[in-house]
Regions:
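A short helix-turn-beta junction within AAA+ P-loop NTPase domains corresponding to the substrate/partner-engaging
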Residues: 186, 193-195, 209-223
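Alpha-helical scaffolding segments of alpha/beta enzyme cores, especially the outer helices
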Residues: 182-186, 264
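Active-site catalytic pocket residues across diverse enzymes, especially alpha/beta-hydrolases
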Residues: 95, 99, 188, 270
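Conserved AAA+ ATPase "SRH/arginine-finger" region at the nucleotide-binding site
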Residues: 132-135, 216-228
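AAA+ P-loop NTPase domains with strong preference for DNA replication initiators
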Residues: 1-4, 35-38, 68-70, 233-327
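P-loop/Walker A NTP-binding region and its immediately flanking N-terminal helices
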Residues: 1-183, 193-199, 209-210
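Eukaryote-skewed repeat-based solenoidal scaffolds used as protein-protein interaction platforms
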Residues: 163, 185-187, 225-234, 245, ...
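Conserved H-loop
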Residues: 202-203
Length: 327
């Protein structure tokens, strides 16, 4: 790439907030008058969650919770792309500061069954740690040993924004097995004096009741189609994407409320003048093959999708969405 070439910046990096100061979106009339970079210059201290575009009530609630040292354990749950991880990042910034985005790789030793030692790399900042479950029996050892070591690794209350607890963030809570969740419940009880647990999942039905009862459960809903259309239209206007209204409606309908998916599709249309990627085209062809009872083509399309690391349950779910949308 030449020095004169501009680096491509994707919409998902520009419009998914990276910090508190990013969450405020002006009204459309004012929107076009702003320079693109000035949108991210608004300060949290001079604003309030009422001015944000999505999830105003949740952010107001989190603002109040963050001001109290008796913070509860929290589970965020909602559909993919509804904004759970973004809300968690903003919440952690409310509690501490922007240094929560400075993540380093840390090594932890986890002893599994048979006294086997496993070295695990996890992301952590000065204030919190992020645990990614593996969806297997190893998860219960992972949570027990990492939290135990993390709780005693750094002395507390030595940073500028001192709190008497650290945060343990657990992603994909509903991927944990029953025994891993019971182990997590015991771990939460044991280390609740020095750690708070902030977790997210897609469905609370896969989380055991003893775990739910020990946490504040916050539902992160999908946005209405009207709000999504206005949001996407504002972005397309700001980015000077000539987007017909029927294409915009198609993007919103097929994105199932997933904010990141909407931004990726806007980017796709901006650079290629189309909104469907190769995977979505393959799904339509697969559906046609099913209707024609063509077993060989069905196997071929499924195989091609699965070797690109797309899970079978995802393929089935996306097929069902197409059927419900088009038929």
């Amino acid at each position: 790439m030449d020095d004169n070439d501009e680096k491509v910046e994707f919409l998902v990096d520009k419009y998914i907030p990276n910090s508190i100061s990013d969450i405020y979106q002006p009204e459309y009339e004012y929107y076009n008058k702003l320079d693109k970079k000035s949108i991210k210059s608004l300060d949290w201290k001079d604003s309030s969650p009422d001015k944000c575009y999505f999830h105003k009530n949740i952010l107001n609630r989190l603002k109040l919770i963050s001001e109290d040292n008796s913070l509860p354990h929290i589970i965020f749950y909602g559909n993919p792309g509804s904004g759970k991880k973004t809300l968690i990042n903003l919440f952690l910034e409310m509690i501490y500061d922007k240094s929560i985005y400075k993540l380093d790789d840390s090594k932890y030793t986890v002893i599994s069954s048979g006294n086997m030692e496993n070295e695990i790399i996890v992301k952590q900042s000065d204030y919190h740690i992020i645990i990614e479950p593996n969806n297997n029996n190893f998860d219960r050892y992972l949570i027990q040993d990492i939290v135990k070591e993390y709780a005693k690794r750094y002395p507390l209350c030595i940073y500028e924004n001192s709190r008497n607890f650290k945060i343990v963030q657990i992603n994909n809570l509903d991927n944990l097995s029953y025994y891993a969740q019971t182990s997590l419940r015991r771990t939460i009880e044991k280390y609740s004096k020095t750690c708070r647990f902030v977790m997210w999942c897609y469905s609370l039905s896969k989380v055991i009741e003893p775990l739910r009862s020990r946490c504040l459960c916050i539902h992160v809903p999908n946005q209405t189609e009207d709000d999504l259309i206005k949001w996407a239209f504002n972005i397309s206007s700001l980015e000077k994407i000539n987007l017909p209204i029927n294409i915009l409606n198609n993007i919103i309908t097929n994105s199932n409320g997933n904010l990141k998916k909407i931004l990726w599709k806007l980017d796709l249309y901006k650079f290629t003048n189309r909104v469907n990627n190769g995977y979505e085209k393959s799904l339509v062809k697969l559906l046609d093959s099913i209707r024609d009872n063509n077993i060989e083509l069905i196997r071929e399309y499924i195989y091609k999708m699965m070797i690109t690391n797309i899970e079978a349950k995802v393929i089935i779910k996306d097929l069902l969405n197409i059927i419900l949308t088009k038929y």
